[in-house]
Amino acid sequence: MAAKGISTIGAASRSLSSSLMAAAKEPDVENLRLIEELTSNVDAVQERVLAEILGRNADAEYLDKCGLDASDTDRATFRAKVPVASYDDLKPYVKRIANGDRSPILSTHPIIEFFTSSGTSAGERKLMPIVTDEMARREVLSSLATSVLNVYVPGLHTGKGLYFLFARSETKTPGGLTAQPALTSVYKSEHFKRAYAYTSPMAAILCEDASQSMYAQMLCGLCQRHDVLRVGAVFAAALVRAIRFLQLNWAQLAADIETGELNPRVTDPSDRECSRGDWTGIVTRLWPKTKCLNVVVTGVMAQYIPTLQYYSGGLPIVSGMYASSECFFGLNLRPLCGPSEVSYTIMPNTAYFEFLPVGEAVDASNLVELARVEDGREYEVVVTTYAGLNRYRVGDVLCVTGFHNAAPQFRFVRRQSVLLSIEADKTDEAELQRAVERASSALLRPRGASIVEYTSRACTERVPGHFSPALPHWTLAP
C-alpha cells in the first residue's frame, strides 16, 4: 500500500525499490515488500504499535500511576498523561524487578532478562528490561536487513562470514534474572544458532577470554579462507583490533595451521602474504572472495574508516542496522553507500518513536512524532517499547537526511551525554572527530602517516587548561 501525498524523495525510493525487488529472490522479495508497506504507512503503523503497547501494559504499575487505564490507548491521552523519562526516573522500578518483584511494574508481560546498556548511571550499567517476544521482534528486523544486503551484494548465502564476535560475561541480579549485553544474548539464542553461517565455532564466540576467542576465530577464518565472502565485526574498532592481532600473531597462527597438517593451498598463502610486511589490502589477499566489510562505522567508529579502507583495499563498508539495548531502530536501505553517507530508515513497527528537537526544553509538549520530523533537523530520540519503557530518552542524537516513502531516514550524530569540558566549553564526540580529521589532514598526511585510532580526556592538570578542550592520544600508522 502507498500512502497519499508522498514526496518526490519517496517516489524515487519506490522506483529504486521496484528495481531491487525485480532482482531479488524469495524470501527476500517478501521482506522487501514488507519494508515498502511499513515505510509507506508510518503514521498508521505507529498508531497501531502505541495502541498495542498501551493495551498490553494497561495493568502495569507505571502506566497506572500516570493515570492511564485499559481504554486509554490513543496518542492524545498518552501524550497528555505520560511524562518524558530518563533512566534515573525509571531506576527505582527497574531495581525492584531486578530484586525479584514479579508484579506488573513496567510491563504486564514477564521480564525474562535485562540487557546491559553501554551507558552508565551513577557508575552503574543501565539495565534494560526484556520481555519474551523481544528477541523475535529483533530477528524479524535483522532478516529485513539481510534481504536488503542480499540484493545489493548477491550470492552471500553461498559462502561464509568471517565475523569477529565476542560474548561478554553475564551476571545475575539479586532476584535471579540474567543481565548481559544484548549481543551476548543474541549469540546464545536458538535463532543465531539456526541461522549460523560463520567461520568461527560457537565455542570460540562464547569464550569469555577475549584473547583466546580472538585467536580461535582468526585461526578458523584462515583455515576457511576460500569460503569467506564477507568480513566484519559489530563495531569497526573490533575489526581493526582483529587485523592488528593478526599482524602481531601471524607467524604463530601459520605455524599452528602447518602443524595441523592442513592442505598447503590453505596454509602457504597466509604465511606468504603476512610475511611480506605490506599490509595494504591484506583482507582481500588473505580472503580473496571477500565482497564487503560489515561493521558499524557511524559516530565515534568513523575514526576507523581510513584504516579499514587501507586494510581492505577499498572494499565496500556496510553498516546495515541501527539498534541498541532499548530496541531495534532501523535499516540502511543503501548498504553500499559511502561510509560517511550512512543513514538509517526507522522501521515503525519496532517501538513507538518520538523526537525531541535539539536545543528545546525537555518537555512532553515538545516531542515530535516519527511521521512529523523535519528534513535537516537534529533530534534526540525518545522511545516507548513493548517491555515497558515509556517515553524514554535513549540519548542518541540523530539528523534527518531524507525519507524513504513516508519513513524518515536519520544519520547518527552523537550521544547526547558524551562531552569533554574544561570550564564552560562542551565538546561532543562529533566535534572532536572533525578536529582530529582536520589535524590529521594538515599534519600527518603530508608525512605519509595516518591515525589508526584515538581517545581523549579533559586536560585540567594545569591552570588554565589547554586552549584545546581535550588532550588526545593518537595511535599512528606509517
UniProtKB/Swiss-Prot annotation:
Its EC number is 6.3.2.-. Keywords: Ligase. It is an enzyme of class 6 (ligase). GO terms for cellular component: cytoplasm. One of its GO terms (biological process) is response to light stimulus. GO terms for molecular function: acid-amino acid ligase activity. It comes from the Eukaryota. The keyword Translocase does not apply. Belongs to the IAA-amido conjugating enzyme family. PANTHER family: GH3 DOMAIN-CONTAINING PROTEIN, INDOLE-3-ACETIC ACID-AMIDO SYNTHETASE GH3.1-RELATED. May catalyze the synthesis of indole-3-acetic acid (IAA)-amino acid conjugates, providing a mechanism for the plant to cope with the presence of excess auxin. This is Putative indole-3-acetic acid-amido synthetase GH3.10. It comes from Oryza sativa subsp. japonica. The lineage of its organism: Eukaryota, Viridiplantae, Streptophyta, Embryophyta, Tracheophyta.
